[in-house]
Amino acid sequence: MQKTSEAIKAYGLDYTLMPSSGSAMTAELARSEAASKPIIVTGWKPHWMFAKYKLKFLDDPKKVFGEAEHVDSVVNPELEKKAPPVVAFLKKFQWKPGEIDSVMLATQNGEKPTAAADAWISAHSDRVDSWVK
């Protein structure tokens, strides 16, 4: 919430920040969507709400929220000796934007995580095969 408060000040916005939990935020987002009313939420990716709703990030030319982030796979150096296929897989593995969100939405909608993962793998079998060969 601190960065959001800083952004409101930095951009001179006449908004009121309403701190809440993630579930309260998505509930309010659902209500606003159902009523076709605009809303601004503090969102992050990956998150299932991006697969369910048509959301976009607002521009932040002042970089209040910082630069774009990324995720790296980090492994114990000994793993290369103990499990080379695992290391080879991790070097090839990549999610495209939105793919994690769609799997998260499936689990949010009650699907078991393994079933959601299996469905994603089935839909992207060529790519998954390239990771394990």
Predicted regions and their residues:
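Solvent-exposed loop/turn segments at secondary-structure junctions
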Residues: M1, A24-M25, K45-F50, L79-K81
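Bilobed "Venus flytrap"/periplasmic-binding protein-like clamshell domains
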Residues: M1-Y11, Y15-E28, T114
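Active-site/pore-lining binding-face segments in mid-to-C-terminal subdomains
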Residues: H47-E67, V71
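A bilobed periplasmic-binding-protein/Venus flytrap-type ligand-binding module shared by bacterial periplasmic
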Residues: E69-K82
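Acidic/histidine-rich, surface-exposed loop or edge segments in extracytoplasmic proteins
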Residues: K9-Y11, S73, G98-S102
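Ligand-binding clefts/hinges and TM-proximal coupling segments of bilobed small-molecule sensing domains
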Residues: Q2-K3, E78, P84-V128
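A ligand-binding cleft/hinge motif common to bilobed small-molecule-binding domains
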Residues: R31-K56
